[in-house]
């Protein structure tokens, strides 16, 4: 047995076997039950699946956000979000993602072994990342041309403020305009990033055919609530945020819903193209 176990891909023995057999084995069973191996294989495949989920989610999200920040910085006369805002956003988002190791895994994924494919991460990132940027740019346009002018500057866009206001009032309106814009994108980013996790985590139809674990769902929910209330708190004032009017959420809800539908469609196209 020892000779055969040495040349085998995986040698299996029990703890009551002779020493030479146990030394040759890769796995030593504490019980005489091979079902332990099945459980270990299933848990290993679940761990691999959730690891891939997190890597793809984070890579595509960061790529999309980076593209959005670069584009907005080139097009807008001010920064779309301060560095401290980005750090706080990523900190809370990553905290929400900490429940991914306990997420549910589709049974179809664990039926057969999967291989590590680093190239698939780049492909997925290129497909999903720009999808998020497209929605972000649509949000930028809405907040810059419609939302902020309506609630801050009496219908005047940022570039035209100097022709309508002067002195301290001009500076005050500019600061309020930027704060309102940055706050809107800060909240919209957390909503979209957190909810799109449910679109990316499965190849099935999310919420209907496949549901996330309770841990992941609850952390997502609390993360969204926490980010949403920050602008209304003292911490929000310290960070330079502005209190959002309730009408902002009338825009946010359909925007995030459209983003979720769009990501699901792009994901289906990606799976069809790369299967």
Give the residues covered by each predicted segment.
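Membrane-embedded transport module
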Residues: 8, 13-205
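Acidic, divalent-metal-coordinating active-site segment for phosphoryl/phosphodiester hydrolysis
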Residues: 1-8
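Hydrophobic residues in alpha-helical membrane-spanning segments
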Residues: 3, 78, 131, 232-235, ...
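C-terminal transmembrane module of polytopic membrane proteins
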Residues: 90, 146-167, 171, 176-275
